[in-house]
UniProtKB/Swiss-Prot annotation:
Protein name from the UniProt record: Large ribosomal subunit protein bL12
Assembly mode: Homodimer. Part of the ribosomal stalk of the 50S ribosomal subunit. Forms a multimeric L10(L12)X complex, where L10 forms an elongated spine to which 2 to 4 L12 dimers bind in a sequential fashion. Binds GTP-bound translation factors.
Taxon lineage: Bacteria, Pseudomonadati, Pseudomonadota, Gammaproteobacteria, Enterobacterales
Keyword Cytoplasm (UniProt): no
Gene Ontology cellular-component annotations: cytosolic large ribosomal subunit
Keyword Ribonucleoprotein: yes
Family to which the UniProt record says this protein belongs: Belongs to the bacterial ribosomal protein bL12 family.
Record-linked Gene3D superfamilies: 3.30.1390.10, Single helix bin
Keywords recorded for this protein, A-Z: Ribonucleoprotein, Ribosomal protein
Taxonomy, superkingdom: Bacteria
Source species of the chain: Buchnera aphidicola subsp. Baizongia pistaciae (strain Bp)
Pfam families: Ribosomal_L12, Ribosomal_L12_N
Gene name for this UniProt entry: rplL
Stored InterPro entries: Ribosomal_bL12 (IPR000206), Ribosomal_bL12_C (IPR013823), Ribosomal_bL12_C/ClpS-like (IPR014719), Ribosomal_bL12_oligo (IPR008932), Ribosomal_bL12_oligo_N_sf (IPR036235)
Free-text function comment from the UniProt entry: Forms part of the ribosomal stalk which helps the ribosome interact with GTP-bound translation factors. Is thus essential for accurate translation.
Length: 122
């Protein structure tokens, strides 16, 4: 004689929450499974985000001590005029360049760091 699903469900419905939690834990151990189901959509989104990251933004966080050198570096990198570059630098934290390759972003970060600026790549 076997027990039906309905009989199992009836027995579980009469149990306390703590007993159900213990039952689930015991079942996980017995069958070597986990009740936590990984969300495939979240995993897929994380993979797509990691693969799709081909464009980067360079964020000027702070100017540092040598504002003139930072302005010159920003002018050179962006092609802005003196006033526009000065205004951009003085508005830190701000994005200096958007949607550039990783190599270009790393190069710009290195140049700006050499002038004493604090830079982050996003």
């Amino acid at each position: 004689m076997s027990i039906t699903k309905e009989q199992i469900l009836d027995a579980i419905s009469e149990m306390s929450v703590m007993n159900i939690v213990e039952l689930i834990s015991d079942m996980e151990k017995k069958f070597g499974v986990s009740s936590i189901i990984p969300s495939s959509s979240t995993s897929t989104q994380n993979i797509e985000t990691a693969e799709a990251k081909t464009e980067f933004d360079v964020l000027l966080k702070s100017i540092g001590g040598n504002k003139v050198s930072v302005i010159k570096a920003v002018r050179s990198a962006t092609g802005l005029g003196l006033k526009e570059a000065k205004d951009l630098v003085e508005s830190a934290p701000t994005i200096i360049k958007e949607r550039i390759t990783q190599d270009a972003a790393e190069s710009l970060k290195k140049i700006l760091n050499e002038t004493g600026a604090e830079v982050e790549i996003k």
